[in-house]
C-alpha cells in the first residue's frame, strides 16, 4: 500500500504544480514568447480539437521531468502540441521523444512545429502507422503517452507494456470524456497486477497514469 500511496501522492503534487503554473505566468514553468506563439498557432488551427489542453500539456511536461524519463514515446502526435510539452520535459530530464503520427499532413505539421518551438533536437516525429513503426524502435520506454484512436488503446497497451521499463509510466488521454470508447483498456489498466493506476483530470478530458511496479506481479497485487 505504501508504494501506491507514494505514487498517487506524486501524481497529485504534479497536478497541483501544473495548476499553479497555469495560473501564474511568471512561474519557473513560464514559456518563452516563441514557444507560446507556436502553441497558440497550433490551437488556432486545431479545428478537429485533436490537441490536448494547455493544462494537460503542462502536466505531461512535469511528469516527464519528475520521472527523469530518458526514452519517451508518443502515440498520436497530431500537429505537435503535446509533443512540444513532452519535449520541454525531456530537455529537463535529459531524455528524447519519439512521436508517431499516422496522418501525413499532421506529421509534417508536427515536425515543423517542434522545430519552430526549439525542441527539434529532443523530439523526433515519425510519419506512419504506429502498429508498424513501434516494433522498429530499439530499446525500452520510460514514459509512453497515448492519444490515438480510442478503440485501439487496448491494442497499443498490449504492444507497448512489455517494453515499458520497471518504474515506467504509461499515460493515456481522454479517459474521462471518451471513456465509453476504451472500456477494455480501462478495465485492463485498473486491474493489471503489475500496475498502479490513477485517473487525473487537469482539464475535463482526463488522463490515466499507470506506474509499472518494480515488484513481481504476485507481490505487486498485494499493494
Q: Which positions does each model-derived feature cover?
A:
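A short alpha-helical cap/connector motif
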Residues: 2, 6, 20-145, 150-171, ...
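Bacterial N-terminal signal peptides
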Residues: 8-19
Amino acid at each position: 500500500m505504501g508504494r501506491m500511496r507514494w505514487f498517487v501522492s506524486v501524481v497529485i503534487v504534479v497536478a497541483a504544480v501544473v495548476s499553479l503554473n497555469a495560473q501564474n505566468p511568471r512561474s519557473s514553468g513560464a514559456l518563452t514568447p516563441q514557444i507560446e506563439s507556436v502553441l497558440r498557432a497550433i490551437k488556432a488551427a486545431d479545428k478537429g480539437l485533436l490537441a490536448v489542453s494547455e493544462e494537460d500539456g503542462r502536466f505531461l511536461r512535469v511528469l516527464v521531468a519528475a520521472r527523469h524519463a530518458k526514452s519517451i514515446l508518443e502515440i498520436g502526435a497530431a500537429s505537435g502540441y503535446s509533443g512540444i510539452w513532452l519535449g520541454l520535459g525531456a530537455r529537463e530530464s535529459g531524455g528524447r521523444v519519439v512521436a508517431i503520427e499516422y496522418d501525413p499532413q499532421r506529421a509534417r505539421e508536427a515536425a515543423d512545429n517542434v522545430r519552430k518551438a526549439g525542441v527539434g533536437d529532443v523530439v523526433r516525429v515519425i510519419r506512419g502507422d504506429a502498429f508498424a513503426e513501434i516494433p522498429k524502435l530499439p530499446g525500452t520506454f520510460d514514459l509512453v503517452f497515448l492519444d490515438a484512436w480510442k478503440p485501439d488503446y487496448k491494442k497499443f497497451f498490449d504492444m507497448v507494456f512489455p517494453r515499458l521499463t520497471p518504474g515506467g509510466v504509461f499515460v493515456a488521454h481522454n479517459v474521462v470524456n471518451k471513456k465509453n470508447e476504451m472500456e477494455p483498456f480501462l478495465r485492463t489498466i485498473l486491474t493489471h497486477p503489475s500496475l498502479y493506476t490513477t485517473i487525473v483530470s487537469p482539464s475535463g478530458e482526463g488522463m490515466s497514469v499507470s506506474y509499472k511496479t518494480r515488484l513481481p506481479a504476485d507481490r505487486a497485487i498485494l499493494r
